[in-house]
């Protein structure tokens, strides 16, 4: 996802 990440390592996912 490219919106608001739930996890700190989920930014580019």
Swiss-Prot record:
Sorted UniProt keywords: Manganese, Metal-binding, Mitochondrion, Nitration, Oxidoreductase, Ubl conjugation
Cofactor(s) it depends on: Mn(2+)
UniProt EC number: 1.15.1.1
Modifications the protein undergoes after translation, according to the UniProt entry: Nitrated under oxidative stress. Nitration coupled with oxidation inhibits the catalytic activity.
UniProt keyword annotation of Signal present: no
GO molecular function: manganese ion binding; superoxide dismutase activity
Catalytic reaction(s) noted: 2 superoxide + 2 H(+) = H2O2 + O2
GO CC terms, sorted: mitochondrial matrix
Domain of life: Eukaryota
Cofactor note (record): Binds 1 Mn(2+) ion per subunit.
Subcellular location(s) per record: Mitochondrion matrix
Subunit and interaction comment: Homotetramer.
Described purpose of this protein according to its UniProt entry: Destroys superoxide anion radicals which are normally produced within the cells and which are toxic to biological systems.
Sequence similarity: Belongs to the iron/manganese superoxide dismutase family.
Name assigned to this protein: Superoxide dismutase [Mn], mitochondrial
Organism: Canis lupus familiaris
Gene name per UniProt: SOD2
